[in-house]
């Protein structure tokens, strides 16, 4: 087992033991890829929401909030393209019986080759020191050139497969690259099939009168159908944005890696409406803005990178992910997408209602273009948890876990600890606690030796402990 895999298992175990995350319905053996946020987890999650909302809505005069419903008219999802195009290309390994997304298998293959390039560059940097010219090295080193050619060719073929909706050629690419099952090492693959990810349910008083609707697979459509209502009632001029935090649901067949990929999850999204022709400028602006926001959290600049999309969603003309270095490698944390006017135009067509903005500066009406920023809140939670998880060695050769969560995100900002329960210390400590708890979230603990109480607070990420002793 690798160090990262071992560490990830410890993080998952710690999350349960210290009240951050529980398996949903655990007494009934749980429900796969569905989790509950426990007493400390819900506080951390709420702090992440508050921080994002303050920075996105409170600090921006041209962004307002919305809380749209989970259930929407079913035609919404026909218009958005989800009914016909919200699919994952899935492939099974005949030997391990495990199922994978075909595009992810290929992307992981590309990442391994990129890792080889990075190692060559790192070795050269150490060898040549300050005289090293990375650009020249990339242009002249035979191994780097060969590996880069493999990456470029693979991306080109994969893109053509998706553009042509050619699953046969996509399967051939996996075979030609010699991609193996990450678990079994087998190359014995089935054909690739598309699988729609939406959950359906019914609405109505009886089976005869009910109609099929969907649990929303994303929160964005609730913003788009309310675009004109929000714009007119808030009297906002373009460019302006609408932000939302809410639950979404996807019938993920391949739901692994703890809370990274779940069937019920939460998104923090902002749709920014702009004048057609200016979307590229705003796309680059929001890319830069969002990366600055993430790095300001203090989780380590080296843990972030951009990954521009080669395969674009049906609504986008440009897309990039901010990836975070999770215990299982760099994976998507936030997506920034230039969605063009696809969504509003589609909803105009299917609803028969105009979704246009009248621009008084040019005296014209037009369908705005949209730049989207979308964070998976649960992934954000995991990024904070994983980067804050530290295992410290003690003098007696034992270890203890400390969560070094940024103070403004920690479940409790302060813990009040009476040194002992007698001599009036508990009463005095409780008075301090009662006076302060109205201002921010505080923990109070008087059980066990004070050293153990310090360790408990370290384990849940409390930044400050106030010990009430006889000199207080």
Please identify what each model-predicted range represents:
Residues 1-472:
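NTP/phosphate- and nucleic-acid-binding module
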């Amino acid at each position: 087992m690798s160090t990262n895999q071992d560490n990830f298992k410890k993080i998952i175990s710690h999350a349960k033991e210290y009240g951050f995350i529980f398996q949903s319905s655990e007494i009934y053996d749980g429900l796969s890829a569905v989790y509950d946020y426990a007493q400390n987890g819900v506080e951390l999650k709420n702090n992440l929401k508050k921080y994002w909302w303050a920075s996105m809505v409170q600090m921006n005069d041209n962004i307002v909030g919305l809380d749209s419903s989970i259930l929407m008219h079913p035609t919404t999802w026909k218009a958005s393209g989800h009914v016909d195009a919200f699919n994952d290309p899935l492939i099974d390994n005949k030997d391990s019986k495990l199922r994978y997304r075909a595009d992810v298998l290929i992307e992981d293959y590309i990442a391994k080759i990129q890792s080889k390039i990075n190692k060559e560059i790192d070795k050269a940097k150490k060898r040549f020191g300050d005289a090293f010219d990375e650009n020249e090295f990339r242009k002249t080193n035979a191994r780097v050139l060969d590996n880069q050619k493999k990456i470029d060719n693979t991306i080109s073929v994969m893109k053509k497969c998706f553009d042509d909706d050619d699953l046969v050629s996509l399967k051939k690419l996996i075979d030609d690259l010699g991609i193996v099952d990450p678990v079994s090492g087998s190359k014995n693959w089935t054909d690739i099939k598309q699988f729609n990810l939406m959950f359906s349910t019914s609405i109505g008083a009886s089976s005869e009168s009910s109609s099929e609707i969907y649990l929303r697979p994303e929160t964005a459509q609730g913003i788009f159908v309310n675009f004109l209502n929000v714009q007119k009632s808030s009297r906002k001029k373009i460019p302006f944005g609408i932000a939302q935090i809410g639950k979404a649901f996807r019938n993920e067949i391949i739901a692994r890696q703890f809370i990274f990929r779940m069937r019920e999850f939460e998104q923090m999204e902002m749709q920014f409406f702009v004048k057609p022709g200016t979307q590229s400028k705003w796309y680059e602006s929001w890319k830069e803005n969002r990366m600055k926001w993430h790095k300001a959290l203090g989780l380590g600049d080296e843990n972030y990178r951009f990954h521009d999309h080669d395969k674009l969603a049906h609504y986008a003309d440009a897309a990039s992910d901010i990836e975070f270095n999770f215990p299982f490698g760099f994976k998507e944390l936030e997506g920034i997408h230039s969605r063009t006017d696809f969504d509003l135009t589609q909803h105009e067509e299917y609803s028969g209602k105009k979704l246009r903005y009248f621009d008084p500066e040019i005296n014209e009406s037009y369908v705005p273009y949209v730049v989207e920023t979308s964070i998976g809140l649960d992934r954000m939670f995991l990024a904070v948890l994983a980067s804050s998880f530290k295992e410290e060695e003690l003098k007696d050769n034992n270890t203890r876990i400390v969560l070094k969560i940024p103070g403004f995100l920690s479940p409790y900002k302060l813990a009040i600890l009476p040194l002992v329960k007698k001599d009036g210390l508990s009463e005095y400590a409780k008075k301090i606690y009662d006076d302060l708890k109205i201002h921010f979230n505080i923990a109070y603990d008087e059980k066990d030796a004070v050293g153990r109480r310090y360790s408990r607070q370290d384990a849940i990420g409390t930044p400050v402990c106030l010990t009430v002793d006889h000199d207080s």
